[in-house]
Amino acid sequence: MGKEKVHMNLVVVGHVDAGKSTATGHLIYKCGGIDKRTIEKFEKEAADIGKASFKYAWVLDKLKAERERGITIDIALWKFESPKSVFTIIDAPGHRDFIKNMITGTSQADAAILIIASAQGEFEAGISKDGQTREHALLAFTLGVKQMVVCCNKMDDKTVNYGQERYDEIVKEVSAYIKKVGYNVEKVRFVPISGWQGDNMIEKSEKMPWYKGPTLLEALDMLEPPVRPSDKPLRLPLQTCTKIGGIGTVPVGRVETGVMKPGDVVTFAPANVTTEVKSIEMHHEQLAEATPGDNVGFNVKNVSVKDIRRGNVCGNTKNDPPKEAADFTAQVIILNHPGQIGNGYAPVLDCHTSHIACKFAEIESKIDRRSGKELEKAPKSIKSGDAAIVRMVPQKPMCVEVFNDYAPLGRFAVRDMRQTVAVGIIKAVTKKDGSGGKVTKAAVKASKK
C-alpha cells in the first residue's frame, strides 16, 4: 500500500435539467464502486422501460430511491476514484431535502461541481433570475464550499455541436456570475463535457480539439485537499443516545472538530452534564482516539439516557466546552417564503443535529446578499430573496457556535411549511454561564488524574 489517497466530499449542483444525474452517474459508473453485475441489471431495467439512453442517470435514480426509502446502501456506490483521490458524492440536488442536507449535511462538502446545460435555451433558463444555477452557487459559497469545477454539459447537443463559441459564451457569463457570488474565478476550472457520450469526462475528447484544458476527472484531481479541523476544541453533536445492557449509556454522533480519547472529561450542552469517556467505538472496533469525520459511539459513566439527547453537543470540559446559547446573531438569506417575515416569526431551525424553534427576535438590518453592506436599518419585514442580520432566541435550550469558529455548528436551515425557507450562518453567540451543572463522580475522579 502506497500513501493513502486524499478523500474529498463533493456536492453536485445546477439547474434541474442540466444533466447532473447523467454526468455523476457516468463518473461513478466508470471509476466507481458499482460492480458490472449491478450495472448490467440497471441497463436491462432501463431498456425494459424504454429508457436505454438514461442508463447513467438510472444508476443514480436507483441509488436515490433506495436512499429515500431509507435503505442504507453501500456508500461505495457513491464513490469514485482518480489516481490521486477518492471522491464521495455527498448529495445531488434531485433530493427534496437537498438544501437542508447541504446545511445540516452529513458532512461538509470540500468542493462543488456546477453542471451547466450548454444547449440553446437550456443554459439561459438555468442562469435566469428564477434558475437554480444561481441559487445553488450562492448557497454553496455561503455555506463555505469555496472550491468549484464548472462543467459545460451537453456539448453533444445539436444546437452546440461541440462548438467553441458557445463554450466561450457560457464561460464568460458564468464567470461573471460566480465572481459576484464571491468565488475566485482564477481558481475555478471550466470543462466542456458530454455526460452522456463521455467526452472529456475521463479521457480527452477528440471532438473538441480546440479545448486544451483538463478532463473533468483531472480537474477534480487538481482541487486542494481539505484541512480537517482536528486542532480545534472538540465538538461532537449527538445523533442518538442509547442504553446498552452490560455497558451503559452510549451517545452516538460524528466528531465535527477536535479529537476525543478514552479518559477525557467531557461536557454535554445544553444539558450541562459533565462526565468521563470510558471507551470509544467505531464499526464495532475500539478506538484510541476519534477525529473529525468519525461516526462513533462512546460509553459514558454515571449518566442516564434521560440526561442527554439528540441535538446535545459534547466537548472537552477543559478546552472551550460547549455552552447553551441564550441568543445568537445570524446572517439569514430568505430563499422561498410566500409572505413577509417580521419580528416574532418562530420557525424551526435545523442546526447540526438539533431541531428547535427559534424566534426572530429582532431583524437588525437588511443587507446586500453578496457584499454584506447594510441596505436598511431595522426593516419592518423581509421577504424571499432578501438577506438580513437577525437576532434569534431559541425557544428551548440549544447549543450553537459561530460559523467561523465551528462551521458545522454555525450554519442552519430554517424550516417552515415542510420546506427550507431560509438558510443562515451564525456571526455571534451569547452563551449562558455553564456553572452549576451535573458533574458525575467519574468526572471528578478523572479530573484529578
From Swiss-Prot:
Signal peptide feature range: none
Database matches in InterPro entries: EFTu-like_2, G_TR_CS, GTP-eEF1A_C, P-loop_NTPase, T_Tr_GTP-bd_dom, TRAFAC_GTPase_members, Transl_B-barrel_sf, Transl_elong_EF1A/Init_IF2_C
Residue span of region G1: 14-21
Gene responsible for this protein: TEF1
Region (G3): 91-94
GO cellular component, one term: cytoplasm
PANTHER family (alphabetical): TRANSLATION FACTOR
Keyword presence, Cytoplasm: yes
One of the Pfam families matching this protein, by short name: GTP_EFTU_D2
Domain tr-type G: 5-230
Anything else known: The Kennedy pathway is the major route for phosphatidylethanolamine (PE) synthesis, as shown by reduced levels after using RNAi against the first two enzymes of the Kennedy pathway.
Lineage: Eukaryota, Discoba, Euglenozoa, Kinetoplastea, Metakinetoplastina
5-glutamyl glycerylphosphorylethanolamine carried by residues: 362
Presence of the UniProt keyword Heme in the record: no
Entry protein name: Elongation factor 1-alpha
Region (G4): 153-156
A single GO molecular function term of this UniProt record: GTP binding
Protein family (similarity comment): Belongs to the TRAFAC class translation factor GTPase superfamily. Classic translation factor GTPase family. EF-Tu/EF-1A subfamily.
Cellular localisation: Cytoplasm
Role played: This protein promotes the GTP-dependent binding of aminoacyl-tRNA to the A-site of ribosomes during protein biosynthesis.
Keywords of the record: Cytoplasm, Elongation factor, GTP-binding, Nucleotide-binding, Phosphoprotein, Protein biosynthesis
Region ranges (G2): 70-74
GO BP of this protein: calcium-mediated signaling; microtubule-based process
Reported modifications of this chain: Phosphatidylethanolamine (PE) is a direct precursor of the ethanolamine-phosphoglycerol (EPG) moiety.
SUPFAM superfamilies assigned: EF-Tu/eEF-1alpha/eIF2-gamma C-terminal domain, P-loop containing nucleoside triphosphate hydrolases, Translation proteins
Chain positions covered by the region annotation G5: 194-196
